From Swiss-Prot:
Pathway: Cofactor biosynthesis; thiamine diphosphate biosynthesis
Superkingdom, natural source: Bacteria
Reaction it catalyzes: [ThiI sulfur-carrier protein]-S-sulfanyl-L-cysteine + a uridine in tRNA + 2 reduced [2Fe-2S]-[ferredoxin] + ATP + H(+) = [ThiI sulfur-carrier protein]-L-cysteine + a 4-thiouridine in tRNA + 2 oxidized [2Fe-2S]-[ferredoxin] + AMP + diphosphate; [ThiS sulfur-carrier protein]-C-terminal Gly-Gly-AMP + S-sulfanyl-L-cysteinyl-[cysteine desulfurase] + AH2 = [ThiS sulfur-carrier protein]-C-terminal-Gly-aminoethanethioate + L-cysteinyl-[cysteine desulfurase] + A + AMP + 2 H(+)
Protein's UniProt keywords contain Acetylation: no
PANTHER family per UniProt: TRNA SULFURTRANSFERASE
Residue span(s) of domain THUMP: 60-165
InterPro entries to which the protein is assigned, alphabetical: Rossmann-like_a/b/a_fold, ThiI_AANH, ThiI_fer, ThiI_N, THUMP_dom, THUMP_ThiI, tRNA_STrfase, tRNA_sulfurtransferase_ThiI
Organism: Anoxybacillus flavithermus (strain DSM 21510 / WK1)
SMART domains found in the cross-reference section: THUMP
The protein's name in its UniProt record: Probable tRNA sulfurtransferase
SUPFAM superfamilies xref list: Adenine nucleotide alpha hydrolases-like, THUMP domain-like
EC number: 2.8.1.4
Taxon lineage: Bacteria, Bacillati, Bacillota, Bacilli, Bacillales
Amino acid sequence: MTYDHIVIRYGEMSTKGKNRLRFVRCLKRNIAKKLKHFPNLQIEASRDRMYIRLHDTPPHPVIEKLQEVFGIQSLSLALKTESDLQKIKEATLFFVKQFPYEGKTFKISARRADKQFPITTNELNYELGSYVLKNTTGLTVDVHHPDIDVRVEVRKEGTYITAYDVPGAGGLPVGTSGKAMLMLSGGIDSPVAGYLAMKRGLQIEAVHFFSPPFTSERAKQKVIDLAQRLTEFGGTIRLHIVPFTELQQAIYKQVPENYSLIAMRRAMLRITDEIRKKENGLAIVTGESLGQVASQTLESMVVVNDVTTTPILRPLVSMDKTEIIAIAERIGTHHISIRPYEDCCTIFTPKAPKTKPKKEKIIQYEKFLPLDEMIAQTVARVETITLKPNEPLDELF
C-alpha cells in the first residue's frame, strides 16, 4: 500500500448553490493548467471534493503547486481502498503505521457519503478504532485532542483515508469573478493587491506606466518579473506597458507642482480605463492604502476617482505597510519589488503634494493641456506582453 491520491477540499465554493458546478469546473481547469508538467496525474471532480490520482507521481511537488491555486481550502495525501469493511480496516491500520505512533493518541473520524454502506458512522468508528488498537502498541484513544486524526470517507466509488491537512490558498478560483485591470508599479504594494484580487476570483491584466529615459529598461524588467511571478497564482497575464514620458512631462510643465501628482494619477486612471474598455474588463485594481502617502488620502482618492465611473478596487486600503510587506515576502514578490530602480511615480515626486485637493482646481489646471488627444495617442502606442506560468523570461523577447 502507498499514498495514491490527493484529496482537495473546496472553500467558499461550497456555498455557491446553483453556481457551484461552474466554480468546480473553473477550479479543475486551473488545477490542470497548474499541474501540466505532471503528465501522469488524473483529476476527478465531484460536487464537494476533488481527487487527484497520482499514478506513482511523487506527491510533495504536486502539493507545493496546488498550494498556489486559489479556490482550495485544504488538501491531504490519501489512500484509496474498496468500500469493504475489512479492506478499510487494513488500509486504516497501514495509514496509522506511517506515523511514529508509539506513545501517541489517535481518533477515527468516519464519514459515510455513501448511505448504502451497511454499518452506521458510529459503528464504523468503533470497528476501525478497535482494529487499530488490537494491532498496535503504545497507542491510545483521545477523541478530543488526538495526535493523529484518521479521517475515513466512505463513498460509492471507494473509501479515502487521510490523516492531516495541508492549508490551501483559499479564496475563489481565478476567472469566476470577471476581469479587472491591475495598475502595476514596481513597488511592494501593487503586486500584493493583484494577488489579493486574484484570490477573490478575478482574472487580472496588468497596466504599467513606463517613462524612458527617466525610468530604465531594468525598471521595466522588474515589472515584467513581478507580473511573471503573479502568473503562478492566476495563470496567463497580459501586461500592458504604457509609454508615459510625453504626457508626464506635459503635466509637470503645465500643472502647479503641488497638484501635479493628482493630475498624473487622474491621467493614469483614464488611460487604464481606456485599456480596460478594449480588453472587456469590469474594474480597476490599485495598490493604494488609505493615508499611506499624500496621493492616498481619502480626499485625493475622491478627486482621482472622478475621471471614471468604473469600480476601483483597493484590496490594501486598510492594511499597514508591515502587513503588506509580510504578504509580499510570503508570495515571493518582495525581493523583486525592492530592486533599486525607480518607476514613473517616484521620479517627479513634488516636494509638498496636495493632500486635500479641490476637484474644481484640478479640472481648471487640466484645461491647459490637450488631455483627450494625448491620452488617445498614448493608448495607441501601448505595448502588450503575454506572460505565462513556468515560462523562462528570455523566451519572451
